[in-house]
């Protein structure tokens, strides 16, 4: 089994999304995340957290689709991660995407 970092990308930061959400939307979002986490809990190493604004350091320009959160999952393959992510509430929001990165154990380097 390998660990995978899931980066939740969206055009607005998590804090901006929360600022603009109604109490009903916040409650519905929390319930959707709880339902997904319950369904795929076997694969969740770290459910993660929403992330605040991004600071860009270094040359070049920052991405317009910032990382608004993360999770760490454990699975046998990237294909398995794709099936685990089916029904993930983040993907139901307009303009969002998920980036899947396999974590390489430091002892394997």
Give residue spans per PLM region.
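Conserved, structured core segments of small domains
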Residues: 1-109
